[in-house]
């Protein structure tokens, strides 16, 4: 069984160090993945990039990315770049769309 941590959508300015401490602890305990979310205000990719840079084994990805906020090409380039830079630890999760 694989376990993951959902960091959700939060105020990263106020809680970045707490979330990073949780990510490091989960990494040391053998958790397999960490997930962030986004809404208008802060994005999902930037915090997980910080977590990828500060952990060793866990994979990280955005559980939800708002497609109206970025093009499919930019999403693919972001995913490919982070996957290369993290040694294959980037996960591309659910890609949501706005309600019509």
Describe each PLM feature range.
Residues 1-61, 98-99:
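N-terminal beta1-alpha1-beta2 module of alpha/beta enzyme domains
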Residues 2-16, 69-99:
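Flexible, glycine-rich active-site loops centered on histidine and acidic residues
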Residues 41, 66-67:
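Positions that flank functional sites
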Residues 59-65, 91:
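A short, GP-enriched loop/loop-strand-helix hinge that lies immediately N-terminal to
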């Amino acid at each position: 069984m694989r376990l993951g941590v959902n960091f959700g959508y939060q105020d990263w300015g106020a809680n970045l160090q707490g979330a990073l401490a949780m990510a490091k602890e989960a990494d040391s305990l053998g958790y397999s993945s960490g997930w962030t979310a986004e809404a208008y205000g802060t994005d999902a990719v930037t915090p997980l990039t910080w977590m990828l840079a500060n952990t060793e084994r866990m994979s990280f990805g955005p559980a939800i990315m708002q497609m109206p906020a970025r093009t499919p090409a930019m999403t693919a380039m972001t995913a490919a770049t982070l996957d290369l830079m993290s040694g294959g630890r980037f996960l591309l999760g659910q890609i949501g769309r706005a309600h019509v």
